[in-house]
Amino acid sequence: MRYEAIVIVTPEVPSIRDADRVVGILLSKGIKNIKLIINRIRPNMVKTDDMMSIEDVKNILGIDLLGVVPDSEKIIVASNRGEPIVLEAKSCLPGKAFENISRRLNGENVEFLDLNRPGGRNSVKRILKNLINRST
């Protein structure tokens, strides 16, 4: 039987340190197909060097990236209401990020959202408009 694992981290030192230990344990058990999800990233904090970047986290852990979920108040609100954030995929970046992760898990080749580019939200709107136009 072939096992796979997904390691979910936040870009904070304690989380990365714990994830590094988990990756080591998984590898020692023969689990080599390990994917990474970086949760609650804040691009503005990365720009000011107050948070590790996506590349920093990938380099430290040395595993393939499955997805990145930006931090958002919408996640907190949806969680408190018991609503899945993916229902907001068309109107919020975290919802789109979760949708993209699930599509990658299903084997689709999906580009990563550009969270570092100014106007990143506009690029998501552009992508969604293109998807809608293709399906009609």
Residue ranges with predicted function:
Residues 1-67, 71, 76-77:
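Conserved catalytic-core segment of NTP-binding enzymes
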Residues 34, 90, 113-116:
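Residue-level detector of alpha-helical recognition elements and their boundaries
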Residues 51, 59, 92-99:
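Short, well-ordered alpha-helical segments
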Residues 55, 73, 96-99, 103:
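A generic structural signal for well-ordered alpha-helical surface patches
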Residues 81-96:
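C-terminal boundary of histidine-terminating zinc-finger modules
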